[in-house]
Curated annotation (Swiss-Prot):
Coiled coil regions in record: none
Protein name: L-threonate dehydrogenase
SUPFAM superfamilies: 6-phosphogluconate dehydrogenase C-terminal domain-like (SSF48179), NAD(P)-binding Rossmann-fold domains (SSF51735)
InterPro entries, per the entry: 3-OH-isobutyrate_DH-rel_CS, 6-PGluconate_DH-like_C_sf, 6PGD_dom2, 6PGDH_NADP-bd, HIBADH-like_NADP-bd, HIBADH-related, LtnD, NAD(P)-bd_dom_sf
UniProt keyword terms in alphabetical order: Carbohydrate metabolism, NAD, NADP, Oxidoreductase
Highest taxon above the source species: Bacteria
Native organism: Haemophilus influenzae (strain ATCC 51907 / DSM 11121 / KW20 / Rd)
Oxidoreductase keyword on record: yes
EC number(s) stated in the UniProt entry for this protein: 1.1.1.411
Similarity section: Belongs to the HIBADH-related family. L-threonate dehydrogenase subfamily.
Gene3D superfamilies xref list: N-(1-d-carboxylethyl)-l-norvaline Dehydrogenase, domain 2 (1.10.1040.10), NAD(P)-binding Rossmann-like Domain (3.40.50.720)
One GO term (biological process): organic acid catabolic process
Amino acid sequence: MENQNYSVAVIGLGSMGMGAAVSCINAGLTTYGIDLNPVALEKLKAAGAKAVAANGYDFAHELDAVVILVVNAAQANAVLFGENGIAKKLKAGTAVMVSSTMAAQDAQIISQKLTELGLIMLDAPVSGGAAKALKGEMTVMASGSKQAFELLQPVLDATAAKVYNIGEEIGLGATVKIVHQLLAGVHIAAGAEAMALASKAGIPLDVMYDVVTNAAGNSWMFENRMKHVVEGDYTPLSMVDIFVKDLGLVNDTAKSLHFPLHLASTAYSMFTEASNAGYGKEDDSAVIKIFSGVSLPKKGA
């Protein structure tokens, strides 16, 4: 199938969803956008989407695929099966790529509901950040049938630099993402703790950042997130509350396996403390603000 004859709707036009949708447009796919935020809808329409809407009723029957990039399982269920859910309007055989971070059990429940409607699910969480999403370079950790992968190949080609086929069982992709989020959350929390200690010890944070990013202690998360701290800019690309949710899923998964997670539990407590202190809607690097007596850079200073 030629790309221009392949129609896809992206539901959830946040930083990752917007990037994925724009990448689909850039790849020549006929692209639709669904979101409750009119500003996001206007932005995607200006980027070349065929149509945008708060729900996809008017164009659902035209779609070959749907990509779900909302925050969690509850939102995924709502946009698919809720009062204004799109699932019942899709034609049989439509592929649904569920990319929200959720527990394996939630992914399996959604898959069962979609199967009952004649729809085909790929359990396909994503990572890489907003910049990579916009360039079509996300990492996708996916599980599902061979048919699901084949039906969604144009979308995967458009949006991803790396696609990992974890297996056929729905829930495997979700579990890999949860383990990944353990590392992501711990890396941010550790980076924040290190920068807070540096500040307390009188080390300029721009100097500390430069040293770490050119030394063995660096990580992708440190380099990406602690730059926000150095700039004093906590405009959210991924919020503190996202990691309250994701590290909660990490701990729930470990609990179900009777498996101890010492570092992840501490990181979860740190993000929860930051959220409780009023920083939940700020960038996740704002977890550094839980440390008292620490002088942090101000934006534009």
